Amino acid sequence: MAKTIAYDEEARRGLERGLNSLADAVKVTLGPKGRNVVLEKKWGAPTITNDGVSIAKEIELEDPYEKIGAELVKEVAKKTDDVAGDGTTTATVLAQALVREGLRNVAAGANPLGLKRGIEKAVEAVTAKLLDTAKEVETKEQIAATAGISAGDASIGELIAEAMDKVGKEGVITVEESNTFGLQLELTEGMRFDKGYISGYFVTDPERQEAVLEDPYILLVGSKVSTVKDLLPLLEKVIQAGKPLLIIAEDVEGEALSTLVVNKIRGTFKSVAVKAPGFGDRRKAQLADIAILTGGEVISEEVGLSLETAGIELLGQARKVVVTKDETTIVEGAGDAEAIKGRVAQIRTEIENSDSDYDREKLQERLAKLAGGVAVIKAGAATEVELKERKHRIEDAVRNAKAAVEEGIVAGGGVALLQAAPALDELKLTGDEATGANIVRVALSAPLKQIAFNAGLEPGVVAEKVSNLEAGHGLNADSGEYEDLLAAGVADPVKVTRSALQNAASIAALFLTTEAVVADKPEKAAAPAGDPTGGMGGMDF
């Protein structure tokens, strides 16, 4: 395909236009008074959301340079979402501010590489300041406040805090759709481990990239499964029972994998293959944990069991299994409660007797998975559109709460970033590096200004006032009051705030140091087919 090339200022400005198109659509959602964005879908009802990364993913621009600019900012939102689960809009607003200020200085003759070094040093200083001022999350109320802000609903925050209280920091919280109105919290015995589906063809929900199995059988194998003849007798029994199958093995490959995939695509048999978690003896132990949880047996030559002769009675069962590309969650395994208690007691004894910190940590993880269980938040709404939007907000808030517990919280509403700016005064930078640090200083006020703007206030006046208040005090955009934000429950996880800044700065530095952009040349639309009557087109009938 032919390429088109832009250089210098033309290249950078093309990228900036794309960034601005995307950022302008995303930033209207920031803060408690932010608005929603409606996203058209090719199939089904439109989606209404205020989630930055969901909006960013939907934006496709026509101009090739603008398209690349937008894609770079999508990366900021996506990376922040992956790391922290929230802060995607803040990251986009920061990226826009950094690029705008940076390009202004590049156009005025500043050295882009000097600016890049200055930005990186400034971000490092601000990140250290944020981590230094973070307060540990100690109470259920603090978790509720943080999650409530992320979801834009205090009742959701309280429910998430309740769920975390029940399953602990290590426990698993999932969100499901409900047929009834309102929110419900259900605690179910369950387990999650960090291995996803072996092939993307197993996915049953393409939009969420998940494979969901209801009431499945669970086959646990201590070795590789590669030949279909080993698997066939057992598969036939499972198909006769009319249930889906989850296979957890050292690996599933070759004709065994292709047989499962082909049957899934044809719709004759629903299954998912997953690699067993861990390595060596740890893998054996975790497979045994899953066997006890699901009421099955690990099929292994060590215990005299083989796939060819295995019956359906050796399979485990569960109410539901959800598999993503990275992890598997087993909900309500059919294992015997007494056997699970015995296994938990055995692991606790191993923890007490272990001399190795690493082994102890791994045993604690296994204990949390066996004993912690899974909290299920069931969300209901009047329409499918509202239900999707609500479910998405709750999922974001759960990740937000976990981030808060992990690294602590800082004042929300963009205040922590603005009040971290004095950390830049301690940097002894000169020339373009000093200019780079100043670009970061200007950008730090951007999220607060956008929140104020969305709340109908004058951004410059609000930023000036907040910069002169004592640390932690700022604008509560919901009430319009200036107060101690942590005391008022307006807090952000420091992990979210620092990730937003770090990812925004990373992309901004790439923007500034770009000197040429190579893009695909837009293809011209094919000419309409000629008149089959041949040369009669001018006649009027």
Swiss-Prot record:
GO terms for cellular component: cytoplasm. One of its GO terms (molecular function) is ATP-dependent protein folding chaperone. The keyword Nucleotide-binding applies. One of its GO terms (biological process) is protein refolding. It catalyses: ATP + H2O + a folded polypeptide = ADP + phosphate + an unfolded polypeptide. Keywords: ATP-binding, Chaperone, Cytoplasm, Isomerase, Nucleotide-binding. It is found in: Cytoplasm. ATP binds at T29, L30, G31, P32, D86, G87, T88, T89, T90, G413, D492. Disulfide bonds: none annotated. It is an enzyme of class 5 (isomerase). Pfam families: Cpn60_TCP1 (PF00118). Its EC number is 5.6.1.7. InterPro entries: Chaperonin_Cpn60_CS, Cpn60/GroEL, Cpn60/GroEL/TCP-1, GroEL-like_apical_dom_sf, GROEL-like_equatorial_sf, TCP-1-like_intermed_sf. Together with its co-chaperonin GroES, plays an essential role in assisting protein folding. The GroEL-GroES system forms a nano-cage that allows encapsulation of the non-native substrate proteins and provides a physical environment optimized to promote and accelerate protein folding. Forms a cylinder of 14 subunits composed of two heptameric rings stacked back-to-back. Interacts with the co-chaperonin GroES. This is Chaperonin GroEL 2. It comes from Nocardia farcinica (strain IFM 10152).
